[in-house]
Amino acid sequence: MKIRTFFAVLLCKLARGLLRLLRRGGTAFPGRVALKVYPQVLGVLSRGVRVILVTGTNGKTTSSRMIEQAFADAGLNYFANRSGANLISGITAEFAMHSTLTGRPKCQFAVIECDEAASKTVLKHLKPEVIVATNVFRDQLDRYGEITHTLNNIIEGIRHTPESVLCINADCSLIASIPEHVPNPVVRFGVNVPLGGDDLTEISDAPHCIHCKTEYVYDYRTYGHLGAFRCPKCGYHREAPQVAVTAVQNLGVDTSDVTMSIGGREYAVHINLPAAYNIYNAVGSAAALSAFGFTPEAIVHALGAFGCGFGRMEKFDLRGTPGRMMLVKNPAGCNQTMRYLAGLNEDATFVVCLNDRDADGTDISWIWDADFERLAAMGEHLRHVYVSGVRADDMRLRLKYAGVDEARIEVFYDYDPLIDAMCASEYPVFIMPTYTAMLDLRGRLQKQLGGKEFWE
């Protein structure tokens, strides 16, 4: 075992070093090499490391960054898979890079983002102290299948680690059912008030009771199927969260201000990101940090100080034009981005980049469920719409049927002229790419304009 660990770690480090010299990310392939040499190496490398693991459909990267900030503020010796390589190969690579050749950890702590489908495999080997389950939404139907399949993957993974503290979203009727299937200690988090309107017309990925299939009723909805749900037939309902947002003072263009209950006391919390869905990321991170032993004061400071993950409300200077990039990958997340954009009340240029590679989901039918009509409703504030990516023509057609003025839509089949157009914009630029489009465009932006690589 020791010999296999040695060679697994050695080859992983060599592969990572070579790929970085070639200016490649090297975030997952080195882990695949290590797992080929020793399939159980992750379990060996993670011994003695105190881990917070974040999984779920939306919010993994941003929540992980919020948690990281608290670790950094406390001066803890930690690492994280901040590149977004969240399958078992990427996670294994990160542990190997922070281990000695004999497999001894160099860091005592880790913040790990884990793909929801991969959690059933990762958690066979990794035993986190805290697991955060953010939410479950319809996402990449070609890969994940039905929404309950995603939920079952998470449950199956958690069954391998019964001592981990579960921090679950009380407002997600799917995630809230997890304690029925596992014996783990549970901390619930949620939002006790509507967020920027109670839009009951918004599409719901889980409108019916997970137990008896009766349609839920809501005391209020926050977004998607999240909110104060209850089943009028069998009685399944949202349970009161221990960590909760109890009031919203401000949903600004760049930040938010809320009142949050942590440990039975209320705190004024400034969140260093805008949009309703980031309030969920903040309260989920607060629950995880509280369960891990951080004080409320440390949590509040971290939520106001953290920097966003790449492509998640990330700001760019486009040669003097302000730009912001917001990853979109499914109807629920896209709708929240649209809600944020529709509330800006300023002239802007919008960019939508649609790819259909494996990491994006090859089935792009989700764009017809996303509420792009909100863009059309912006009227004269919608100055330009630039469309790009492998499926740019499909996106142009979707925007046409959403009611966007065709005269305002311009298609770019290459990123270099798109970047030139963004930099020449007289208005702030808001970029909405799918995952691989984000990596492609961000890489091209980095080469032209400078900035950090995506793994930094």
Task: Map each language-model feature to its residues.
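Conserved active-site and cofactor/substrate-binding residues in soluble primary-metabolism enzymes
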Residues: 28, 49, 62, 86, ...
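Adenine nucleotide phosphate-binding catalytic loops in nucleotide-utilizing enzymes
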Residues: 187-331
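Phosphate-binding loop of NTP-binding sites
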Residues: 3-190, 196-208
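Short glycine-/acidic-enriched loop or helix-start segments at secondary-structure transitions
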Residues: 63-64, 121-122, 142-143, 176-179, ...
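Residue-level signal for inorganic ion chemistry
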Residues: 113, 134, 167, 281, ...
